[in-house]
């Protein structure tokens, strides 16, 4: 059993990161792992990854299954249209999953196969830490990315002291743009490139005013967390990972 508001939030927070790869159907869905300690929802397309954890909905017996994107989208519409927060009963066997709430029953086939080992993709040692205003970063990336290369859609972060330089260029069109933002940065001077579309999708998914971005080297993934100094311990945790784009000199 899971509350409708929690389930709806879990779907919203993860579904945008699913892949549409015909070759790897597992990535076309959202992994749901239910344990005695809580529930984890994971989505990835190999460029970005979202791991959304809830400690307030656990089960007696561990189980995991991959939920397809289309039924989840439909389910989310039903959950959102229902104004009151209600309990959703989730039942599954090897091939199907069933959601029961109010007057609705939604049955869907599960995606066959084994989900990739997503924990192996999450780098553990990330000494370079950036804390910055989410809206300011989002707006800046949007503006600068207009001048990015059409093929890579790359924006470059140059971090030094408490300054973040965001830079993009399109050599074919002979255009470039740069903006400098104030930030709180602890770590070594570094340059790292990201796909602007993936990055703005991630930033759109952060609910807090500030965000924390952890990085190690330019060829390893960056990790984004919501950041709130005053926040109490909550029952939810979200980790978003974005793969870098190789820097073109």
Where are these regions (language model features)?
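Structural preference for solvent-exposed beta-strand-turn elements
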Residues: 1-249
